[in-house]
Amino acid sequence: TDVSGSPAIGQDAGLAAGLSENGVIIGDDPRELFEQADVVIDFSSPAASCAHADLAAETGIALVVGTTGLTPEDEAVLEKAGQMAALVYCANTSVGVTLLGQVVEQVAAQLGDSWDIEIVEAHHHHKVDAPSGTALALGEAAANGRNVSFDDVRDSGRDGVTGQRRQGDIGFAVMRGGDVAGEHTVTFFSQQERIELTHRAGSRAIFARGALRAAAFASARKPGMYSMEDVLG
């Protein structure tokens, strides 16, 4: 589906994507989509994702949400929908990023807060939220590794005279430009050494493959909230 008034409405989805015709016509009624689908994949906006979560709850149709920029209130809507339908929610459907998050958590647990953690991310200039959902998820993974609240250690607003870096904080820096599909680097700093963990997306196709894997997983699951870690097993 697309928003009402979009020039894509009525077009074949395959042709609109630059592929061969597949017989799937783009519409603007999400409810009709849910009634005809086994699984719905949603990469849209926070407001649209919440509306789709409500429809998943009403219809019992599995839903994969890869939208970023959701507030805690938005996430609560998804959690509620997960009581009635299988719902996979993740900031990034890439298999590589999912594994990176697991590694970051393990490294953070081993090193402790005497090592400074900084996360740098880069995306295309059309991206509207910052830091990216993936960067924040990596920060949460690091905080989990240290067994601390992410909200207490997140530092993403540096500007001007900020004072000395607070021990234990997890810092963020953002770059926007060109057509970058997504790059994320988590760096652990000590006084005499540095560890860098990086993931670079060469194509958005990796997100599509991961989303399809998540959809296949969700279609065979009972109602509940799931993550890409669950999908990978």
What do the predicted segments below correspond to?
Residues 25-29, 60, 84:
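Hydrophobic/basic alpha-helical segments enriched in Actinobacteria
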